[in-house]
Amino acid sequence: MTRVRNDQFDAAKGLDRGRSKPVEAAWYLLKCCVFLTPLPFPSRLKCALLRMFGATVGSGVVMKPRVNIHLPWKLAIGDHSWIGEEVFILNLEPVTIGAHCCISQRAFLCTGNHDFRQPDMPFRSQPIRIEDGAWVGAQSFVGPGVTVGTEAVISAGSIVTRSQPAQKVCAGNPCVPLKDRWSRL
């Protein structure tokens, strides 16, 4: 017999969704119609809709098609940042993306996890912070509690489970700093 008890998992325990069920349902419908579609709705429209639902979004933000934002009221994006196609932001806790950042195609920013040491596997969520000028490469995973430092580069396909320092090129599984971003070749 297994010690894991998924039947005892309580999705409401330890999680504040931040808005009422009707607001969440309205966001879900809008997200399906405007954000998850391959149709290239203008970034300005998407940013305005995010603001209507409580997100903080700076000027000049570019948002490509098929971006999946779980809870917009727990999202802040700085000026002139770029959110690539099929980026998934699972923000059960706040996600802060600084100014002039690039979150590349299919990157996954995930604030949620489970405590696997307990049989009922309760939520264990922490915020994510992507500082100014950072670049999260395509198909990278950024996990709960991570800060990506100012002007850091996370190479494509990296698994980031610990904070990464400023102005470094970081890569791998697990992601580690490899070299200075601005060093001469």
Predicted feature locations:
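Secondary-structure boundary/capping motif
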Residues: 58-59, 98-99, 149-150, 158, ...
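Beta-rich strand-turn-strand
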Residues: 138-153, 158-162
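Flexible, glycine/small-residue-enriched loop-and-beta-strand segment within the central core
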Residues: 38-47, 66-77, 82-147, 173-174, ...
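Terminal amphipathic alpha-helical/low-complexity segments used for targeting or macromolecular assembly
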Residues: 1-55, 59, 100, 133, ...
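Acidic, glycine-centered active-site loop in nucleotide-sugar glycosyltransferases
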Residues: 166, 171-174
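Short glycine/serine/threonine-biased micro-segments
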Residues: 135, 155, 170
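Conserved short histidine dyad/triad with adjacent acidic residue
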Residues: 62-64
